[in-house]
Amino acid sequence: MTAETILLSLHLSAPELILAVGALVLLMVGVFSGERSGLVVTGLAIVLLLASGLWLLFVPAEGLAFGGVYMADGFSRFMKLVALIGSLVALFMTMGHARENQLDKFEFPVLLVLATLGILLMISANDLISLYLALELQSLALYVVAAINRDSLKSTEAGLKYFVLGALSSGMLLYGMSLVYGFTGHTHFTEIAQALSVEGARSLGLIFGLVFILAGIAFKISAVPFHMWTPDVYEGAPTPVTAFFAAAPKVAAMAMLTRIVITAFQPVLADWQQVVVFISIASMLLGSFAAIGQKNIKRLMAYSSIGHMGYALVGLAAGNQTGVSGVMLYMVIYMIMTLGTFAIIMSMRRKDGTVVEDVNDLAGLSATNPFMAVVLTALMFSLAGIPPLAGFFAKYFVFVAAIEAKLYALAIIGVLASVVGAYYYLRVIKLMWFDEATGEFARVSSALRLVFGLSGLFVTAYVLIGGPIGGAAELAAATLF
């Protein structure tokens, strides 16, 4: 590599370099800043994430870096901005609640920055090896974050369960990659696509490799049948950590899955489409039915998340440009709805400081905290896909893509699953507005109020402000085709 290509590579990967160098600086600051290290490092971590996002926004650069293993294009830029917003909001939400969740250690924001670095690299990965390394960087940070509350048995259990199942999924992914490399002789996505375009290149071993890769990535997005870790980890991990898990890593994994199937495996679309359709249907149905009996609101959100990943996969199964832009839009709307809901869950504490997570504790919320009740009602209606809220448009675009691809059965099952899924969202609304209050919540912090207030505003005003976001998603999706 010449000096010119090295400089070009560094320029293209500047958002990641900001986080990588910044994380090392944060470690030094944390060691030398005494008792207030947690707060200082969290503030600096937010500045780092902002700097990375602003670079992406105002210094658009496209091209291949580091010998073609890193791709900077419109798709990666869009998804990175979404993921950075998710990380930024999740970190901002922890600031007022760090001590009670054992998150006041300076290592926590550093781990979040390292996980976000892995997330950005995952989105730009253009090679099987760079994809795996980025995925592991993100995963290793998240394993520690899940178990960071050492005084909580549930948190420790969540971290251990996530680690064991995560290691299993990484092994499946790596085995799939080795099969694909063995049958094509390449690890670059574009070269894999060229090798698969040759007549007779599609062999049984290659299809096995593809299935293993899809299985490994399905674990990361909590898709059925690789969802087992999600309810336990969501319930056991500290709530600010769960909010992060539900946002940025899901965006990155979905972006990674989209890039690999559209760029590398487009010539064998008929093969991976069947697998994605199955995973999508299973996720939608399990997410809708399993959430009905849940009492813990974090477990309910875990099954809701599984269902939503199923809906997003409807767009990916279509395998067309409309589907990809639908997936991108779905992830934006899903992330904002989820972060808003978790901001409200973090606000569920009694005046004596007791944290409550039972759905029934929301009873009578409209009488004790009308603003929170109104926002949560809007978010629940949006998660259920009720028009004219943002969640309706998210589902509408992926179903339209499925119909364009003649996947009529998939679209019909998706609509029916939405109807079933609406039950548990409406149950929460009924509790808030029609049941007697069981007690008042403590005063909500201004940070959380800001997050859920803006989320509620977004889902209700999406019909007016959604045009530019949809247009940006379409332009970004076009770069993959």
Swiss-Prot record:
Keyword field contains Transmembrane helix: yes
Membrane topology summary: Multi-pass membrane protein
Q: Name one GO biological process term.
A: ATP synthesis coupled electron transport
Any idea which UniProt keywords this protein has? Cell inner membrane, Cell membrane, Membrane, NAD, Quinone, Translocase, Transmembrane, Transmembrane helix, Transport, Ubiquinone
**Catalyses which reaction(s):** a quinone + NADH + 5 H(+)(in) = a quinol + NAD(+) + 4 H(+)(out)
Its subcellular locations are:
Cell inner membrane
InterPro entries in UniProt = NADH-Q_OxRdtase_suN/2, ND/Mrp_TM
EC identifiers of the protein = 7.1.1.-
Q: Which domain of life is it from?
A: Bacteria
Transmembrane segments annotated in the record for this chain: 12-32, 39-59, 78-98, 106-126, 128-148, 163-183, 204-224, 237-257, 272-292, 300-320, 326-346, 373-393, 407-429, 450-470
GO cellular component terms given for this protein: plasma membrane
Molecular function per GO: NADH dehydrogenase (ubiquinone) activity; NADH:ubiquinone reductase (non-electrogenic) activity; quinone binding
Major subcellular location class: membrane
**Summary of subunit composition and partner proteins:** NDH-1 is composed of 14 different subunits. Subunits NuoA, H, J, K, L, M, N constitute the membrane sector of the complex.
| HAMAP family named among the record's database cross-references | NDH1_NuoN_1 (MF_00445)
**Family per similarity comment:** Belongs to the complex I subunit 2 family.
The free-text function statement in the UniProt record for this protein reads:
NDH-1 shuttles electrons from NADH, via FMN and iron-sulfur (Fe-S) centers, to quinones in the respiratory chain. The immediate electron acceptor for the enzyme in this species is believed to be ubiquinone. Couples the redox reaction to proton translocation (for every two electrons transferred, four hydrogen ions are translocated across the cytoplasmic membrane), and thus conserves the redox energy in a proton gradient.
UniProt protein name: NADH-quinone oxidoreductase subunit N
**Protein source organism:** Rhizobium etli (strain ATCC 51251 / DSM 11541 / JCM 21823 / NBRC 15573 / CFN 42)
